[in-house]
């Protein structure tokens, strides 16, 4: 009998280990289980929000995050290239949103009285749009992921000259990188020829 308990205590027989009182030891609970479950929930939501996410295989957390970032960059590119973007004033929009939130906080008691009174349709539409949660569009209506070639900027520079200088600087950096890659690729065969001559 002692050999049986010795085997059980080491766990070599596949049976659970026994403690000193002869009871089965349970595995301690993991502290990160709640956090892990919450992270899985958020990753699952992200997978549902981003279109063209591979469904036929299990994705790592990093792959999911990369797809999300790529999709956000694509949306930002589309926003930047939208024809109305030139007419958009980000500072005025932010000021209007902040003013709307301040008005909602200070006038919460008066909201019931105003609702009964006649309200301007434009103001009503603005409030409804601000209060509605963002609707999730169907995956078919979303844009596909592509490689991003432009910098990650939301608002165009204030001066056109700065924008032009930034583009020229980026072009120079790309040319320098391509030249370095070319010189590295040319240097490798030359080194191989030298090594073969020496031997």
Swiss-Prot record:
Main localisation, per the record? nucleus
- Location of the protein in the cell: Nucleus
Entry's Gene Ontology BP terms: chaeta morphogenesis; chorion-containing eggshell pattern formation; compound eye cone cell differentiation; determination of left/right symmetry; dorsal appendage formation; dorsal closure; head involution; hindgut development
Give start-end ranges for the coiled-coil region(s). Answer: none
Which residue positions does Phosphoserine occur at? 106
Looking at the record, the residues that make up the bHLH domain are: 23-75
GO CC terms, sorted: cytoplasm; nucleoplasm; nucleus
Name the domain of life.
Answer: Eukaryota
Here the segments flagged for biased composition (Low complexity) are: 161-182
Q: Which intervals of the chain are annotated as region Disordered?
A: 127-199
The protein's UniProt keywords, in alphabetical order, are: Nucleus, Phosphoprotein, Repressor, Transcription, Transcription regulation
Pfam family for this entry, one: HLH
Q: Name one GO molecular function term.
A: transcription corepressor activity
Q: What does this protein do?
A: Participates in sensory organ patterning by antagonizing the neurogenic activity of the Achaete-scute complex (AS-C). It lacks a basic DNA-binding domain but is able to form heterodimers with other HLH proteins, thereby inhibiting DNA binding. May sequester proneural proteins in complexes inefficient for DNA interaction. EMC also affects vein differentiation. Inhibits the activity of AS-C proteins by forming an non-DNA binding heterodimer.
Assembly behavior: Heterodimer with other HLH proteins.
Q: What is this protein called?
A: Protein extra-macrochaetae
Source species taxonomy: Eukaryota, Metazoa, Ecdysozoa, Arthropoda, Hexapoda
